[in-house]
Amino acid sequence: MQIDLNADLGEGCANDEALLALISSANIACGWHAGDAATMVQTVKWALERGVAIGAHPSYPDRENFGRTEMQRDPEHVYADVLYQIGALDAIVRAQGGELHHVKPHGALYNQAVRDPALARAIVRAVRDFDADLVFFGLAGSQMIDIAREAGLRVKQEVFADRGYNPDGTLVKRGSPGALHEDEEVALNQTLTMVREKRVRAIDGTWVPIQAETVCLHGDGAHALAFARRIRERLGAEGIAVRAGD
């Protein structure tokens, strides 16, 4: 058994270089919610040195709120936004002799696309038009994944180690009770259950079927690095290999 571990990097956290030793895929901020050209260059360099798969992490133009505030942007504007950000990171990756592997939307853009098919189609179209061989990372079981598949893209269904789930398989909104698992043991057990048993316990206590193909580890927070080490060690102890795959 194997699983991909991904983390959002290039967002101004001090853990990036150390996290790259523990993950298999890196989603690099493209400057619109965090980071800049210099952080993109440095993070790509570190990822290439460690053989970590590199992905673009496009967002709404929202540095003030870290890309976590919902916006009502026209799908054509979103298409252009995403295409622009992928292109910027791809140029940096190619300049260093690497190859872009995937795209994962960030924050509010990601969560709104789970609910809004027009938004999801705009994001997916930008990815496909840029490079139809890129892998699309999206919320496991969501219409965003279905739309990407219908467009002919390869997908990785993403689950979250430290986030709470609603009974419909969506994430509990940040700031709401149960949105984040502060207890590392709870997050570890949730991850193993999702990977091994293909299910997750929702905040109402019900079990929700889920397909875990990549697990997101958040790189921010005081204990992020220690938790990443624990989850990597636990997966190894359970005989689960960590690798990006195709």
From Swiss-Prot:
It catalyses: 5-oxo-L-proline + ATP + 2 H2O = L-glutamate + ADP + phosphate + H(+). GO terms for molecular function: 5-oxoprolinase (ATP-hydrolyzing) activity; ATP binding. Its EC number is 3.5.2.9. Signal peptide: none annotated. It comes from the Bacteria. It is an enzyme of class 3 (hydrolase). Keywords: ATP-binding, Hydrolase, Nucleotide-binding. Disulfide bonds: none annotated. GO terms for biological process: carbohydrate metabolic process. Forms a complex composed of PxpA, PxpB and PxpC. HAMAP family: PxpA (MF_00691). Catalyzes the cleavage of 5-oxoproline to form L-glutamate coupled to the hydrolysis of ATP to ADP and inorganic phosphate. NCBIfam families: PRK05406.1-1, PRK05406.1-3, PRK05406.1-4, PRK05406.1-5. Belongs to the LamB/PxpA family. This is 5-oxoprolinase subunit A. The lineage of its organism: Bacteria, Pseudomonadati, Pseudomonadota, Betaproteobacteria, Burkholderiales.
